């Protein structure tokens, strides 16, 4: 559930604030987030785990705004990071590095060193070469590096190929058939401390079964390692729980967590979860202005001021996100006849679209709201076509706070230089 609802007068509210009042000050395009929704979604995971030992590590890549990260830190959240930049963001936002897990296939020596000195909870190791690198860096610092090994269980998550991560042909993790060998190597390296088993099979999963299939394989591995004298303290099941973009019915966090814990059969192994999209996607929207309506014989276009540089998911993944009017009472058929439009941006590429074949009752100058934009929206934005990235606004009840100012044009060439 989220806190975006239409008022009886047709205005779209986020919590107790009309979005039209926000954009009068911020302009468009603008991302708007709901604090209450973010906190509700995070607590849905934390509460569902109940008394079972657990740590909820928010996936920073989903939305790394300091305002978002600070809310997570206040809740006591852990964090799943994939770069030293994300680690520094977490620390800047007040997050506890002792609750940070560091994922990713290409950790540099500087990143490993910075994370070790910050005292992170664990490295999720993706290759044998990485094991040796972490051991070497930890040795130079005279520290023990806590590690888990990311296992690739060869599970088809049934999701978009770009965000499927648990098959043998994906770049992530160690094949499960090699896991025992790699754990034995890790246990013998002097500056490593084996802590856990890690797995992340993909993103936007809408069924529980792939998670349970992966869990079964991992529990067999953990039992096998125990017979070899390697004790596993935690099991990190990653993230990946989907959200309803277009009528999907993914499991609720409580259903997902209860199924996982039930499958544990009474084991008190600490569980780590890394939700990102499931917390943030429906906690944010992208608001955009209709600049022009272009009516052709075969296709109608609503040309808006947001573009693929602001929200790349539709162009990159052919992702479907609901597009609704900012005011649903502006529907006079004389001035706003209902038509089917492709909603497109100003960027000079045919792939610059936010939605195709959408039935809308709009006029030039109206505003549209792109739902489910709180995850992988602003965080994947760019300056393509030398466009300034949008403002980000956090709503808390009847108050709205700018958590990222709209970029200024002069910032576009900061750090660039011409030849003498």
PLM feature segments, named:
Residues 1-145, 184, 189-193, 220-223, ...:
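A charged N-terminal "starter" segment
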